[in-house]
Curated annotation (Swiss-Prot):
The keyword Membrane applies. The chain crosses the membrane at residues 34-54, 76-96, 103-123, 127-147, 158-178, 198-218, 243-263, 275-295, 297-317. It is found in: Membrane. GO terms for biological process: UDP-galactose transmembrane import into Golgi lumen. Keywords: Membrane, Transmembrane, Transmembrane helix. It is a multi-pass membrane protein. It comes from the Eukaryota. InterPro entries: Nuc_sug_transpt, UCP036436. Pfam families: Nuc_sug_transp (PF04142). This is Uncharacterized protein C12G12.12.
């Protein structure tokens, strides 16, 4: 019972606190470079899993399957999912800048669509007709959620935000497909794979920040743009609470990853997907309670269709007359 509570609490905290951080950091408009800094924080949280990995190595002894024995080329190959994660996470943080926390989280439900498409085309898996029907409900639900956001005053630029999140899901689905491919031929603890990805992510994001700031962000044309990191850092110095929020998010990301991996191992990926639905609902409720957004019937309808599609896809519930 403790693991689901940890996963739900940390998962809700990640999104709500990130959106709250955006809202108190912005001045006349969102600080664009905040998206990259938040991505760096995500990878720092993933890299913190090394503490968990080292604990498991010590507690389980010589029988623990480590990545240390792998050839260098295999370790380098693990940078590929990290690169996909960088693209996906940064785009999603851009989306969170411009739309509400609940619409951001609901739009993330489109991930299952891209994962299914890649599973059939790249991993050569077969998806049944009823599962494709389930995905059509997911598509319809995401479309309604997106329309409810674009047709209301939710966020400063909801169309840009929703588009960024959707493109981000494509990159994350690519990441998940590569991870599944890696884990299919390498017997290794998934937590160590995430720790490696976090380390690669920190390295590549920092390298990208240095290069992009030098050539773009520090120029007159890049002033207060996507790569002007001095802008967001100066804002952090003006509002010290932003540092505290980043620290809490970093810790919650580490707890979310550890608890999620443990739940997948002890129960199933389906259980984890159920908790992710509960996470989405929790984010929506808390965002409304905090006055960050209001109730929209169309958004609720889209959310219901999204849940129905995901539940039927995982066979948690069945379509009427499906067995007849």
């Amino acid at each position: 019972m403790l693991l689901p509570i940890i996963m739900l609490t940390s998962g809700v905290a990640n999104t709500v606190l990130s959106k709250y951080q955006d809202s108190i950091a912005e001045e006349s408009e969102p600080i664009k470079s905040m998206a990259v800094l938040q991505s760096l924080n995500i990878f720092l949280g993933e890299a913190c899993l090394w503490f968990y990995v080292l604990y498991k190595r010590h507690s389980q002894g010589p029988g623990y399957e480590s990545l240390d024995h792998l050839p260098l080329k295999h370790k380098v190959f693990m940078a590929l999912p990290a690169i996909m994660d960088i693209c996906g996470s940064t785009l999603m943080n851009v989306g969170l800048l411009y739309t509400s926390a609940s619409i951001y989280q609901m739009t993330r439900g489109s991930l299952i669509i891209f994962v299914a498409l890649f599973a059939t085309t790249l991993l050569k898996r077969t998806i049944g007709q009823l599962q494709w029907l389930s995905l059509s409900f997911v598509v319809l639900g995401v479309a309604i959620v997106g329309y409810s956001g674009s047709s209301s005053s939710i966020g400063s630029n909801p169309i840009l935000g929703i588009t960024a999140v959707l493109i981000g899901q494509f990159f994350l689905a690519t990441q998940f497909t590569i991870e599944e491919y890696i884990l299919s031929f390498i017997q290794v603890d998934p937590s160590e794979l995430v720790a490696y990805e976090g380390t690669y992510g920190v390295f590549f994001v920092l390298l990208g920040m240095i290069i992009s700031y030098y050539f773009i962000g520090s120029t007159t044309a890049g002033y207060h743009g996507w790569f002007d990191y001095s802008h967001v850092i100066s804002r952090f110095n003006e509002v010290p609470a932003l540092y505290v929020i980043s620290g809490v998010i970093l810790v919650s990301i580490a707890f979310f990853n550890v608890s999620g991996l443990a739940i997948t191992k002890l129960h199933s990926a389906t259980t984890r997907s159920l908790l992710d639905i509960a996470r989405t609902f929790g984010i929506w409720i808390i965002a409304m309670a905090m006055g960050m957004e209001s109730f929209h019937l169309l958004q609720f309808l889209g959310f219901v269709l999204l849940i129905y599609g995901i539940f039927t896809y995982h066979s948690i519930i069945k379509f009427p007359l499906a067995e007849s």
